[in-house]
Amino acid sequence: MTLRNEAALDFLRTRRSRPAKTLTKPAPSRDQLIEILEAGTRVPDHGKLEPWRLKVLEKPTLEKIAGAAKKYCESINCEEAVTAKAVKQFEDGELGVLVIEVQKPSEKIPEIEQTYSAGAVCLSLVNAGLAAGWGANWLTGWLSHDRNFVSETFGLDTNERVAGIIYFRTETVAPAERPRPNLAKIVTWESLKLYVYDRTCRIKKFVQS
């Protein structure tokens, strides 16, 4: 017997990230964030490797990162618009969770599955934040993939990389719905083919099930 959770299905059918420009103060308290983190880290994790770790970025830290981003962009001669956009992400944030993928040596669990698990944490944190009543979004930006910047600013090791930064604030307005995938274009149905052999082991026919 199946047990249908209509409320959960409705949430998943209508969920969407909140654009940063629609969010304002306040951000979740530490106790409120712990609830989100507990829910957000319940993700597929083959081998129980926990190939990720989290850093909570509170406002003073985000301001410090914004300064580091500005300095770094200027050091590599970025255009002003590129620098401004990179800095703004951190300046505007009130509370962020840095999700760091941590590759673990494993003979059974390939690296790509560990990457998927870290990505699952990002989505799960967004969903947990939304379910808790907060505005949440998953932002990364090119700086988060710049090895020099993340090593110096976030203290990442050589086996680590940024999966995403999840921001939480208060929602001011519900965003308009956007186009969603057309299932008819992306889904194919494959049925099992049952082969029937004759006495000489040649295929006599197959039955589509």
Task: Locate the predicted segments by residue.
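N-terminal amphipathic, basic helical "cap/leader" segment at the start of enzyme domains
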Residues: 1-92, 198-209
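A glycine-rich helix N-cap at a beta->alpha junction
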Residues: 87-89, 152-179
